[in-house]
């Protein structure tokens, strides 16, 4: 189907996110065009007439844009046809049962809907797309604030969804993992303790679950303490384990370096936050030594900066890291009563 792209002085083509997160779709309208595009006259009256016509044109185009946006909400152009059929059935059932007017997937991702959790639980495994599945799991967890109850057995449902995703890909997508991290952290379910600790034992996955890891540390389970202490005491071994977890993907140097960087900037600082829940003199000494090394590393990088902006960026990066380290030091000192 031929589409005409609206541009010129009526405004640039509207851009709208597709129903699938993170995949922008440029909005194109069929048959929408400016009327009365003749040459402007030199008379004052002609200019007023042309301004009125332009104003009418803009209203016409805006109405077409709204119509097409509604169409995009109902038909996700980047969804597989099978998933689209399932989505249509899911939305129809939610609208009829919960007495709401959900137009499409984007609406479903943006709102808690009272009574929708059990309906979504019935359909969620039917979707082929793990992106769609992950975007809907928050409905299973529910929300007291929005009077949305938790689906019975949702802990195991969500764990199975995550596990199926993890086993289907060589390396994971951050946006999908964020949804599962949020879900596990909100569940706060000790029914999943063993599974989540096993997840924590893989440093590659550890970096993707900061909220969940902090929750496990707060529970002060001995098995989690062993994981945290191991990561902090053996940083070199961590990167070996990351490479092993990636398997063949580790043969790609760019992928391996990306995951090493993720650990350096995220994983190890989640470890440092978790250490607050396992206070000891030994941990305190190691943290203070790590603080000194971080300051030294910052000074080395600052000395290599060629511009003022580079120095600002380096200071911003290291100030966040030092804040995390120093807060953990302070918390441990309080618990040891040595402030």
Question: Each predicted region: which residue ranges?
Answer:
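Intrinsically disordered, low-complexity arginine-rich tails of RNA-binding/processing proteins
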Residues: 16, 21-47
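N-terminal alpha-helical scaffold/docking segments in eukaryotic complex subunits
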Residues: 46-118, 304-307, 316-336
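Generic helix N-cap/helix-start motif at coil->alpha-helix transitions
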Residues: 64-71, 93-104, 128-137, 169-180, ...
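Amphipathic alpha-helical scaffolding segments comprising HEAT/armadillo-like alpha-solenoid repeats
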Residues: 80-92, 113-126, 146-167, 189-201, ...
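Surface-facing alpha-helical segments and adjacent helix-coil boundary elements at the starts of domains
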Residues: 94-97, 107-146, 153, 160-161, ...
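Extended alpha-helical scaffolding segments
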Residues: 253, 269-336
């Amino acid at each position: 189907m031929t589409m005409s792209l609206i541009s010129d002085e009526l405004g640039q083509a509207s851009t709208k996110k597709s129903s699938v997160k993170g995949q922008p779709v440029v909005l194109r309208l069929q048959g929408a065009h400016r009327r009365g595009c003749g040459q402007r006259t030199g008379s004052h009256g002609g200019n007023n007439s042309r301004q009125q016509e332009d104003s009418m044109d803009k209203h016409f185009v805006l109405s077409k844009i709204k119509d097409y946006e509604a169409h995009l909400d109902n038909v996700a152009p980047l969804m597989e046809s099978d998933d689209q059929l399932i989505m249509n059935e899911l939305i129809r059932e939610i609208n009829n049962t919960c007495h709401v007017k959900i137009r499409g997937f984007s609406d479903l991702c943006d709102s808690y809907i009272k009574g929708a959790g059990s309906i979504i639980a019935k359909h969620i495994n039917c979707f082929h797309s793990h992106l769609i599945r992950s975007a809907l799991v928050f409905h299973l967890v529910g929300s007291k604030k929005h009077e949305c109850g938790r689906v019975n057995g949702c802990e195991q449902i969500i764990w199975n969804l995550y596990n199926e995703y993890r086993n289907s890909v060589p390396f994971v997508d951050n946006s999908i993992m964020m949804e599962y991290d949020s879900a596990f952290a909100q569940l706060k379910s000790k029914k999943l303790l063993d599974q989540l600790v096993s997840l924590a034992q893989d440093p590659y996955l550890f970096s993707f679950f900061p909220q969940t890891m902090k929750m496990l540390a707060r529970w002060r389970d001995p098995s989690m303490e062993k994981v945290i202490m191991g990561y902090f005491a053996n940083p070199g071994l961590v990167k070996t384990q990351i490479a092993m977890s990636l398997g063949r993907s580790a043969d790609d140097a760019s992928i391996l370096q990306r995951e090493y960087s993720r650990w350096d900037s995220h994983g190890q600082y989640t470890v440092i936050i978790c250490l607050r829940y396992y206070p000891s003199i030994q941990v305190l000494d190691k943290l203070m030594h790590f603080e000194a090394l971080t300051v030294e590393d910052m000074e080395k990088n600052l000395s290599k900066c060629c511009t003022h902006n580079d120095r600002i960026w380096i200071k911003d990066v290291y100030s966040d890291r030092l804040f995390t380290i120093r807060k953990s030091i302070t918390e441990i000192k309080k618990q040891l009563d040595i402030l």
